């Protein structure tokens, strides 16, 4: 039975077309795809229900926000449906009052990059319209505009994620920074840079959906961040 299941599924794991020089790598690509597609944990309890979920290393039986954006981009190489499901796991209904997005781990909004990847691959207006208001809610919390978020509580307007997780960009930050309490006054450049990229991605989606008022909001955010980042940066 297992052999039959494998034979039925193996066709969808065929390595993508490649130049002749890379043909020797085809098996490795197929094996990596197989690992990715079976890297699933169950059950994971979230939002009042049990789900199956892709998780880093098949070891952590929980959700991981920043990892899962990258996992979704990998899934898009094999299954756009699985990639969308991975994205949708972290998005909330536009009228949600409980949470702006599903958060665990570093405040790195990789779901916006996954959204852009899916739009580039599908050109689907339906996908754009479904995800846009959910990602807008995510964006507004990430930028201190929604749900009591404290990410933008400094006069500079630069973003600080420390109230939600101990590191900023998916790495372990300098211990001395935390030992000296620097996280009350310091903003990591990477957080505002991600905000800038998220604004640009949503601006493109808003343009596609004809949301001119939203486009203006993102354009103002992009202009302000371009100005305030170099003004307030220290080396």
Give the positions of each predicted feature:
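The feature captures the catalytic groove of carbohydrate-active enzymes
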Residues: 2, 97-106, 143-220
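Active-site cavity-forming subdomains of large catalytic enzyme subunits
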Residues: 130, 134-149
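Conserved small/polar residues in nucleotide/adenosyl-binding loops
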Residues: 1-4, 225-231
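Short amphipathic alpha-helical coiled-coil/interface segments
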Residues: 32, 135, 215-227
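Mature N-terminal, pre-catalytic/accessory segment of carbohydrate-active enzymes
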Residues: 2-18
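Substrate-binding groove/exosite segments of carbohydrate-active enzymes
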Residues: 13-129, 133-136, 187-189, 200
């Amino acid at each position: 039975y297992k052999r039959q299941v494998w034979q039925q599924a193996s066709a969808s794991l065929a390595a993508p077309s490649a130049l002749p020089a890379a043909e020797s790598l085809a098996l490795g690509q197929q094996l990596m795809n197989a690992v990715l597609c079976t890297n699933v944990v169950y059950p994971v309890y979230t939002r009042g229900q049990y789900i199956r979920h892709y998780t880093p290393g098949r070891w952590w039986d929980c959700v991981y926000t920043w990892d899962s954006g990258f996992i979704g981009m990998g899934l898009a190489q094999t299954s756009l449906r699985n990639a969308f499901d991975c994205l949708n796991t972290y998005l909330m209904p536009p009228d949600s009052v409980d949470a702006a997005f599903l958060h665990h781990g570093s405040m790195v909004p990789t779901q916006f990059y996954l959204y852009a990847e899916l739009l580039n691959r599908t050109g689907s207006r339906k996908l754009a319209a479904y995800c846009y208001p959910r990602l807008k809610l995510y964006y507004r919390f990430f930028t201190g505009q929604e749900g009591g978020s404290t990410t933008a509580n400094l006069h500079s307007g630069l973003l600080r994620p420390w109230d939600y997780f101990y590191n900023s960009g998916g790495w372990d930050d300098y211990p001395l920074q935390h030992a000296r309490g620097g996280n009350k006054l310091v903003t990591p450049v990477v957080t505002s840079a991600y905000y800038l990229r998220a604004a640009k991605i949503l601006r493109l989606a808003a343009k596609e959906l004809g949301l001119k008022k939203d486009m203006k909001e993102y354009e103002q955010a992009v202009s302000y961040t371009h100005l305030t980042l170099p003004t307030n940066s220290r080396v």
